[in-house]
Amino acid sequence: MDTIAARALTVMRACATLQEARIVLEANVMEILGIAINRYNGLTLRGVTMRPTSLAQRNEMFFMCLDMMLSAAGINVGPISPDYTQHMATIGVLATPEIPFTTEAANEIARVTGETSTWGPARQPYGFFLETEETFQPGRWFMRAAQAATAVVCGPDMIQVSLNAGARGDVQQIFQGRNDPMMIYLVWRRIENFAMAQGNSQQTQAGVTVSVGGVDMRAGRIIAWDGQAALHVRNPTQQNAMVQIQVVFYISMDKTLNQYPALTAEIFNVYSFRDHTWHGLRTAIRNRTTLPNMLPPIFPPNDRDSILTLLLLSTLADVYTVLRPEFAMHGVNPMPWPLTAAIARAAYV
C-alpha cells in the first residue's frame, strides 16, 4: 500500500505543477503524467489531457486526482456530486508498476508508516496538570489536616507547596499517576511573599530547599526529574514558607504534531477555506474518516490512516488551487464573491 500512496502523491504533485497551459514541463513530470493519464483513461474511460485548458478539462484532471486520493486513502466517498462519480478501478491504476514515483514521495510515505507503527519520546505541548479537576489560588497558604507540608495544583503547569516552620516532606505523589512521563523538567522558586489563610502577608525566609533523590537543587534552574525519585521540600526556618514548582515541559510516549514533518501545516492546508465547493468536498471526505470534518482535531492523530489521509488531502487541496475546477456539490450553494474573512468564518458555523 505504500507504493500506491507514493504514486498517488507523485501524480497529484505533478498535476499541481500545471500553473499555465503553455508551461514547459520537466521531463519527469511528462513521464509521470503521460503514463498515469494513459492508464487512468484506459480503465475509467475518462478523457483527461496532459495540458488542460478548458474548464471541462481542468475538472477532468481534478476528478482524476480526487479518484487517486480516495483510492490511496481507502475511502469510498459515495454520491457527493452530480458531476462526479468515484471510479473504484483507480486503485488498479495506482498499482501499475510502470507509473514511477518520486524519491520525495516515497520517503514521506515511509516516514508516515514508520512513525505511526512505533512510539518515541516526544516533548508534549500541553501543561502537565491540564486535566486536573481542581486548582488552588496561587500564593495563598493552604495546609491539610495532620500535614506539615501540603502540595496543591495552582495552574496547568504548576504546583505550590505550603510548609510549616521546620517542616519537610516529599511531594512527588502529586505528579504520579498523570500522563505517564519519561522525564519532567522542573524549575522551583521561593514564593517571596504569600498570603496566610487570615489574609495577612508573610515572607518565605532564605534557606528553604528542594532536593531530587537527596541532592539539593538550585532555585531558578531547570531540573531533569524522572518522576520517580523523591522530590523533597524542606523548610529549616522558624516561619511558615511556600515554594512554587513549575513544569517547564515533560517528555512522554504520546504522539505529537512533530511525528511527521510539517504536519501542522498540512492540517492547516486541509482545513483552510478556499470556497464553498472545496469546503463541502473536504467535509464529505472527512465524514468517511475518524477525523473531524470541519475543524482541526484537538489532539494529534496517531494512526497511519489518519496522517496519510491528511497528507493526501492537503496535496489535493493544492491541486484544487491550481486547476480551479468548478462543479456542483450536493447541499452546497454557490458562494458570493469576493472572498472575505467573514464569508470564510461563516462557513464553519
UniProtKB/Swiss-Prot annotation:
The keyword Glycoprotein applies. One of its GO terms (cellular component) is viral envelope. Its main location: virion. The keyword rRNA-binding does not apply. Glycans are attached at residue 287. Disulfide bonds: none annotated. Pfam families: Orbi_VP7. Gene3D superfamilies: 2.60.120.170, Bluetongue Virus 10, subunit 1, domain 1, Bluetongue Virus 10, subunit 1, domain 3. SUPFAM superfamilies: A virus capsid protein alpha-helical domain, Viral protein domain. Signal peptide: none annotated. One of its GO terms (biological process) is fusion of virus membrane with host plasma membrane. One of its GO terms (molecular function) is host cell surface receptor binding. Keywords: Capsid protein, Glycoprotein, Outer capsid protein, Virion. Belongs to the orbivirus VP7 family. Homotrimer that assemble in a complex of 260 capsomers on an inner scaffold composed of VP3. The VP7 protein is one of the five proteins (with VP1, VP3, VP4, and VP6) which form the inner capsid of the virus. This is Core protein VP7. The lineage of its organism: Viruses, Riboviria, Orthornavirae, Duplornaviricota, Resentoviricetes.
